[in-house]
């Protein structure tokens, strides 16, 4: 797999912002087929940051309604990447 295709987007919520500031952890939405080793290599190559640990979870899609029709969002995989002390990944700083 190409490393740029593994990482889909950063997950930006109140919780992930707090984790980034306090625990030096960054959260990404990643390809569902990716494993921890591939995610670690992708982050290290794409962002030039050393990774200490990777935790993953499959998030179930929510059920949604459009009038009478009931649908479901797709399931997705979340990766919480813990960076080594002194490392940083900046997404929106300076904007």
Swiss-Prot record:
Ribonucleoprotein in keyword set: yes
Gene behind this protein: rplW
Keyword Ribosomal protein: yes
SUBUNIT field: Part of the 50S ribosomal subunit. Contacts protein L29, and trigger factor when it is bound to the ribosome.
Name assigned to this protein: Large ribosomal subunit protein uL23
Gene Ontology biological-process annotations: translation
Keywords annotated in UniProt: Ribonucleoprotein, Ribosomal protein, RNA-binding, rRNA-binding
GO CC entries: ribonucleoprotein complex; ribosome
Protein family (similarity comment): Belongs to the universal ribosomal protein uL23 family.
Role played: One of the early assembly proteins it binds 23S rRNA. One of the proteins that surrounds the polypeptide exit tunnel on the outside of the ribosome. Forms the main docking site for trigger factor binding to the ribosome.
